[in-house]
Regions:
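Hydrophobic membrane-insertion alpha-helices, especially the h-region
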Residues: 7-24
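Short, Lys/Arg-rich N-terminal segment immediately upstream of the first membrane anchor
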Residues: 1-6
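Short beta-strand element of the alpha/beta-hydrolase
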Residues: 45-53
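Ser/Thr/Pro/Gly-rich low-complexity linker/stalk segments immediately outside membranes or between
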Residues: 25-45
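Serine-dependent carboxylesterase/thioesterase catalytic core
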Residues: 45-46, 59-60, 64-68, 78-85, ...
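Serine-hydrolase catalytic-loop signature spanning alpha/beta hydrolases and amidase-signature enzymes
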Residues: 55-57
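Alpha/beta-hydrolase-fold serine-hydrolase catalytic core, especially in secreted/extracellular enzymes
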Residues: 214-216, 221-251
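A conserved mid-domain beta-alpha-beta active-site/ligand-binding segment of alpha/beta enzyme cores
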Residues: 198-224
């Protein structure tokens, strides 16, 4: 092989080897940034926080879920906040790193604010915040807080190469965690059950909407006392278990 051809081949090999590593480093590096924090009322003891996905700041499905939750959660000491984390959510390659960083900040911010029950709901890339919020809150809060998590078709790709991180870790910090998944949509990293949550697979239920948003609509349509109860537990609904085509009637 002539020297120019050999050099060209070595260059191609170097690019092929280094490109994934460069992308991995890029996706996991997160500069420190400041963002507005959720501001629950001083009287709030039960808080529901919603986290949208990448590019989902004004997602109609999440807006409808927020409205429905407000209608059902009427106690004076309860509050629903849809947290907008755009623009940090908007790049899918960096959403995992940014979500973990921001979640830690939110948890620390919420510590010692009189909150006793926290329900964290994340759609798509919004799934990256709940466990970080929970871990940070438990670290800094002086009193116990009961935490429930709901993951709606969560994206679990961490960085550029780790496709299984979310399916293995999402929900681990919660007292109770559930996931509603659609396994045949075309969004990478959303098709596996979560090992640390109770899973409801809605793939085979008929619908005429975007497959990645379908779990959000399903959850909204089936909200009832059990969906919102802070007493749900993994003795009755084990972590890692999958229930297919379960439809709960709405109140």
């Amino acid at each position: 092989m002539q020297k120019p051809a050999k050099k060209a081949l070595l260059l191609i090999v170097a690019i092929l080897v280094s490109a994934p590593l460069i992308m991995e480093a890029y996706t996991r590096w997160s500069p420190a940034f400041s963002a507005d924090m959720p501001a629950p009322k001083a009287s709030t003891k039960r808080l529901i926080l919603l986290f949208h996905g990448s590019g989902g700041k004004d997602n109609p499905a999440m807006l409808q879920l927020e409205q429905t939750l407000r209608e059902k959660l009427t106690a004076n000491d309860s509050e629903v906040i849809r947290y907008v984390w755009s623009p940090w959510s908007d790049g899918r390659l960096r959403a995992s790193t940014n979500g973990l960083y921001l979640g830690e900040k939110i948890g620390a911010h919420l510590a010692n604010q009189n909150i006793r029950e926290l329900h964290l709901i994340g759609h798509s890339a919004g799934a990256w915040l709940p466990d970080a919020v929970c871990a940070s809150l438990r670290k800094y809060n002086s009193e116990p807080v009961k935490v429930r998590m709901t993951f709606l078709d969560p994206i679990g790709i961490k960085g550029f190469l780790d496709f299984d991180w979310g399916s293995q870790n999402f929900g681990g910090c919660a007292d109770f965690a559930e996931a509603i998944i659609n396994t045949n949509d075309n969004v990478p990293g959303t098709n596996e059950p979560l090992q640390r949550a109770f899973n409801i697979d809605v793939t085979e239920l008929p619908h005429d909407m975007n497959g990645h948003e379908w779990p959000v609509w399903y959850y909204t349509q089936t909200l009832n006392g059990m969906s919102l109860s802070m007493d749900a537990n993994h003795f009755e609904m084990p972590r890692g278990a999958v229930a297919k085509d379960v439809t709960a009637s709405a109140d």
